[in-house]
């Protein structure tokens, strides 16, 4: 149950952001249809141009492809900015439970992202039925998909915001999660190829088949930043729906369990510090090792890259994970 008073407080706090975001998301889809129609009319009015055709083609995306950016901004304002400014304490002192606070923030921001896009989808559908283009390509799949993908991006940022203590930590954690499958699979595979001088794809055929199936791309959130998913089957959208649910549960549980709001730390749960530092150093070692080998094509370059990566990884992890940030 979302308390009405808390909902009003959260709305007033960011009402201009919500209104501007809602208008932008609502207008993007109808604007795309109308812009195509205007281009078609200009073609008809120009005698020098022939073969004019009114087509609505979303196969390569549209301005709505960047709706996930709005999701990121809203999530940062709802959690990361409040933690960085230290205003979360005042919110927690109000007569509401932590669960009610998170639910209100999450579903208010989610509604601002989903509802305007749904209205824009309906308005664009109405325009298409009135203007009658000769062909429409991937309109429904793209429009529904962007609602799902922008909500997934929002849920990811809310989860990272519930785990971390300031804006930079929220954004860096979310970005790391988006590319984590590539880091966990791609970097070790590349290092194996360097050390043992063989092709991982040739030695392990199931890995090659996995990559060729394109599932490797779509189980990572960053795979939906590009427009390749549009050309896949509609069932591909089940993956971001499941990821949205997982991110929501992580964010909800994290917000309930981690009570320190003003400690300025990267992670609110300090038990994450050491494992994350080890991962950062490991990724830096593997990444710089492969880079060193690629530049010199020698094992000396590979070993030099490993040493350099270990040093860089240590300092990056120390100054991001362990060093406390100051509040605004």
Positions of predicted regions on the chain:
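Short alpha-helical transmembrane interface motifs in multi-pass membrane proteins
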Residues: 59, 69-72, 137-142, 235-236
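Alpha-helical transmembrane segments of multi-pass membrane proteins
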Residues: 25-38, 121
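Aromatic- and glycine-rich beta-strand/loop motifs that create alpha-glucan
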Residues: 1-25
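Terminal transmembrane helical anchor/hairpin motif
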Residues: 36-54, 182-275, 281-310, 315-327
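Long, hydrophobic alpha-helical segments
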Residues: 58-81
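Secretory targeting signals
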Residues: 49-57, 108-175, 179-189
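Helix-loop-helix units of permease transmembrane domains in multi-pass membrane transporters
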Residues: 78-114
């Amino acid at each position: 149950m979302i308390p009405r008073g808390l909902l009003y407080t959260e709305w007033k706090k960011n009402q201009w952001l919500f209104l501007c975001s809602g208008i932008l998301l609502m207008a993007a889809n109808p604007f795309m249809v109308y812009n195509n129609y205007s281009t078609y009319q200009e073609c008809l009015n120009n005698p020098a141009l022939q073969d004019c055709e009114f087509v609505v083609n979303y196969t390569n995306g549209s301005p709505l492809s960047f709706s996930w950016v709005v999701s990121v901004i809203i999530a940062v304002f709802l959690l990361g900015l409040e933690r960085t400014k230290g205003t979360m304490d005042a919110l927690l002192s109000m007569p509401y439970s932590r669960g009610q606070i998170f639910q209100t923030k999450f579903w208010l921001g989610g509604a601002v992202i989903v509802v305007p896009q749904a209205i824009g989808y309906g308005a664009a559908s109405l325009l298409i039925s009135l203007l009658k283009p000769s062909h429409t390509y991937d309109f429904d799949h793209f429009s529904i998909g962007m609602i799902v993908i922008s909500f997934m991006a929002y849920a990811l940022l809310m989860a990272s915001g519930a785990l971390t203590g300031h804006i930079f930590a929220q954004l860096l954690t979310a970005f790391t999660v988006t590319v984590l499958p590539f880091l966990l699979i791609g970097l070790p595979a590349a290092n194996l190829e360097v050390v043992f001088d063989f092709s991982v794809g040739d030695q392990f055929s199931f890995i090659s088949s996995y990559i060729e199936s394109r599932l490797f791309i779509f189980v990572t959130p960053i795979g939906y930043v590009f427009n390749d998913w549009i050309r896949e089957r509609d069932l591909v959208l089940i993956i971001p729906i499941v990821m949205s649910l997982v991110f929501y549960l992580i964010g909800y549980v994290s917000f309930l369990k981690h009570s320190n709001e003003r400690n300025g730390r990267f992670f609110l749960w300090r038990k994450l510090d050491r494992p994350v530092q080890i991962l950062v150093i490991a990724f830096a070692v593997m990444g710089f090792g492969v880079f060193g080998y690629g530049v010199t094509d020698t094992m000396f370059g590979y070993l030099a890259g490993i040493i350099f990566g270990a040093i860089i990884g240590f300092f990056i992890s120390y100054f991001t994970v362990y060093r406390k940030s100051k509040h605004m």
